[in-house]
Design a protein with these regions (language model features):
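ATP-dependent carboxylate-amine ligase
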Residues: 12, 50, 87, 107-249
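Acidic, Mg2+-coordinating active-site environments of NTP-dependent enzymes
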Residues: 2-146, 221-231
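Short linear Ser/Thr-Pro motifs
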Residues: 1, 55-57, 193, 204-205
Length: 249
């Protein structure tokens, strides 16, 4: 669906170039490849592919496209309605917000087409699909909306926060932390993203593994310090979540 510098470090890939080469190997070991044409790195990943290639995206050049996107809000469930064009032609709606959710939906639609899944079954599945921990609605108050999302790198966090701002729900509070024994660059970048896009960031501990939680938080603060964003530091995750709920509006 997309690829950005991630999973790079002493215990992961040596470089982004190596990461892309490894992803590209998948398209030399299959008969049909399905790729997001809108991703800026898609041609590099597909270089040397031996499979029959199909693309999807929002651009006119994609084989399978989403057009006419509009935001929806049904009882607190933020979503997107759009038309599927190109290789297929029907109206669709998903109960998850954002362009990234549309890209994920297009991936699923493209796969279903190859397996001959009826269009009505595809439409129903898209309307009803929910993913635990991915833009998951947690009902705690009628005064604000609380969502949980796994967004674990800067690209995912920026996509999420940008999407939520499009719904114009007012004040945006972001509670997050970063995992230990992973790239420190990720922490700086996520701090900068949240500081730039959220009205308030609550920095907390996530899964420190074998690092000191405070050291990870300090790295996040380095990133957020590059912005004018407001933030508060609460190391205990339960207390951080409680603070965000108590101060929600």
């Amino acid at each position: 669906t997309n690829i950005e510098p991630d999973h790079i470090g002493p215990n992961e890939h040596g470089s982004f170039e190596e990461y892309m080469r490894c992803k590209g190997m998948l398209f030399r070991q299959c008969r049909v490849g399905i790729a997001n044409r809108d991703d800026s790195h898609w041609e590099q990943v597909m270089e040397g592919h031996t499979c029959r290639l199909e693309t999807y995206g929002l651009s006119e050049e994609a084989d399978l496209r989403a057009e006419g996107m509009r935001l929806t809000n049904r009882n607190g469930h933020l979503g997107v309605a759009f038309q599927v064009k190109g290789l297929m032609d029907f109206d669709a709606e998903i109960a998850m917000p954002g362009r990234f959710s549309v890209y994920n939906a297009l991936t699923a639609i493209a796969i279903c087409r190859h397996f001959g899944v009826p269009v009505e079954a595809v439409k129903k599945a898209l309307r009803e699909a929910r993913v635990k921990g991915r833009i998951e609605l947690v009902k705690v108050s009628d005064e604000f909306t609380l969502l949980i999302d796994y967004a674990h790198n800067a690209m995912a966090l920026e996509s999420l926060l940008t999407t939520l701002k499009e719904y114009d729900h007012g004040r945006l509070v972001c509670v997050f932390g970063c995992g230990g024994n992973r790239s420190r660059l990720r922490r700086y970048e996520m701090g900068e993203v949240s500081g730039r896009l959220a009205d308030l960031t609550v920095i907390t501990s996530d899964n420190p593994r074998f690092e000191e939680p405070q050291a990870i938080i300090d790295d996040i603060k380095t990133g957020i310090g590059k912005t004018d964003g407001k933030y508060i530091e609460i190391c205990d995750r339960k207390e951080a979540i409680a603070y965000a709920i108590d101060n929600g509006q």
